């Protein structure tokens, strides 16, 4: 599978808290290039042992990512702007879930901000 969106943030804790809460002040975080032109991320949680990633992603006007897939479930909640893939277009409040390995494109005609959740697939026994 072609994994195009990758975090490079190792400067702060991204692990799920063992106790209490984890606060990420997203307004104070820089946008990071995440491997595809015009796609920028603020990684909020990246915990490989728990099999989860949560990102805030900004998609520039006109940005497009070719067909690719992720090894995890991908859940997308559109916060602002417009976002599209090979199946259609989405706006604020729309929620999309992709299965692991689902080939898809991604892009925006006029810019978008989305919240992304990635989680590993587990078998039915948990």
Give the ranges of each region predicted by the language model.
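A short, N-terminal "cap"/entry segment at the start of jelly-roll beta-barrel domains
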Residues: 1-50
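Conserved hydrophobic/aromatic beta-strand scaffold that supports enzyme active sites
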Residues: 41-43, 54-58, 75, 95-97, ...
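Short beta-strand/loop turn elements enriched in aromatics
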Residues: 43, 59-70, 120
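Glycine- and acidic-residue-biased ligand/ion/polar-headgroup-sensing regions
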Residues: 60-61, 69-86
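Short acidic-glycine-tyrosine-enriched beta hairpin
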Residues: 84-105
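Ligand-binding loop in jelly-roll beta-barrel domains
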Residues: 100-125
């Amino acid at each position: 599978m072609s994994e195009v969106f990758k975090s490079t943030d190792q400067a702060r804790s991204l692990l799920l808290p063992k106790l209490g809460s984890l606060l990420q002040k997203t307004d104070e975080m820089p946008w990071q290039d995440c491997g595809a032109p015009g796609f920028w991320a603020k990684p909020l949680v990246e915990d490989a042992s728990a099999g989860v990633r949560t990102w805030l992603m900004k998609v520039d006007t006109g940005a497009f990512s070719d067909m690719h897939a992720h090894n995890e479930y991908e859940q997308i909640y559109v916060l602002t702007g417009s976002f599209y893939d090979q199946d259609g277009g989405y706006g604020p409040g729309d929620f999309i879930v992709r299965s692991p390995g689902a080939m898809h494109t991604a892009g925006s005609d006029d810019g978008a901000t989305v919240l992304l959740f990635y989680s590993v697939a587990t078998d039915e026994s948990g």
